[in-house]
Amino acid sequence: LVTGVQTCALPICMLVLIIGDLHIPYKASELSKIFRENLQPGKIHQILCTGNVCVKSEMDYLRTICNEIVTVRGEYDDDCISNVDQTVLTIGGFRVGLVSSYSLFPIEDKSRLAIKQRELDVDILVHGGTHKASAYEYDGCFYLDPGSATGAFTSSDPNPVPSFILLNVQGTTAIAYIYTLEDGSISVKKAKFSKEE
């Protein structure tokens, strides 16, 4: 696994891969070799996928990293990927909402995301669709967008930066490590969120 992320044994903490918008084979040919080399089996406890994996072979690849996958349906996904638009789960001391980007409009509107967060009554809201990774706190909630793992193009950005998030959850503290791939090398930024008790 890429350096800079602490791993620990369950149930003290969990390492969650947040990934989405691969768009393979429609908008991208594959996940980069560098990302594949760093996403090794046995390190990650769970995967949250924001959709647009597109085909079964890519979902099968994600299962080689971790068999515990929760995914929502993206608008380009084959029927076998998921038929769920949103779901809520508990990770550590957090209620986490995972939502399809096409159920949110506009997808970068913080007030629209906050409405969805309140509707689901979650501490962390995970969404995709922007193809730009972000992790920020807004109105007492942690919002995570893993961006596009392949850097798949959009109508507004022909060259997004490939990215994903590793979320380290320890009780009521979550640290999001945002991995981006630029010019053949990985950089990591982090954002921390603690739930008020």
Describe the role of every protein-language-model region.
Residues 70, 107-173:
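Conserved beta-sheet core of the metallophosphoesterase superfamily
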Residues 11-68, 77-85, 93, 163, ...:
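N-terminal active-site segment of His-dependent metallophosphoesterases
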Residues 170-197:
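Charged phosphate-binding loop/patch that engages nucleotide di/tri-phosphates or the phosphate backbone
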Residues 1-12:
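Single conserved hydrophobic/aromatic residue that forms the stacking wall/gate
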Residues 13-17, 88-97, 138-143, 169-175:
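Beta-strand-turn-beta hairpins that frame and shape the catalytic cleft
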Residues 18-20, 46-52, 70-74, 98-100, ...:
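Active-site neighborhood of phospho(di)ester-bond hydrolases with catalytic His/Asp-centered motifs
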Residues 68-122:
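Helix-adjacent hinge/juxtasegments
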Residues 24-27, 53-58, 76-82, 104-108, ...:
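Active-site environment of divalent metal-dependent phosphoester hydrolases
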